[in-house]
Amino acid sequence: MRRNNKKRIDLIHFILGGASMKRLIAMTIGISFLGLMAGNITFAAQFGTAAEAEAMVKKAVQLIKTEGKEKAFVEINNPKGKFVDRDLYIFVYDMSGKCVAHGFNSKMIGKDLIEMKDTDGKFFVKERIEIAKTKGKGWQDYKFTDPITKKIEQKSAYVERAEDLIVGCGVYKR
């Protein structure tokens, strides 16, 4: 048995070009670390960022201004369009809280959402309207059910006023 182990060690030593056990351990740790880092990068790339959400809103606002509401809403409502990216999507309300466009859930279009609350009782649609009316644009925090995990998660939304509309995009705080 001992002789077979020595042969295996000699074979490993030969394959690694004379590398010592310390070097072998260091290489194994290094390769493992790189694998973990690549996994974290892949995980992060699955989800949108706050900067991407804000940029998406600005593009949607620009489209509304240049192409008009009707053409813009067709693109915003397209689940395979440029306003849906991973877990990011655009939503649009009128100033009374009625949803007029939604990139992720077309069933929301036409619904009055003014009384919608998160799990803490926060009227987040009312808050979006207030931000749009008083500041023109801004961020808000609320809780929302993640459609992937089905769990209630912390979320932030960037909203911006475009004429008589509120254009927004939310990002989960992961």
Where are the predicted features?
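N-terminal membrane-sensor/transducer module of prokaryotic signaling receptors
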Residues: R2-R174
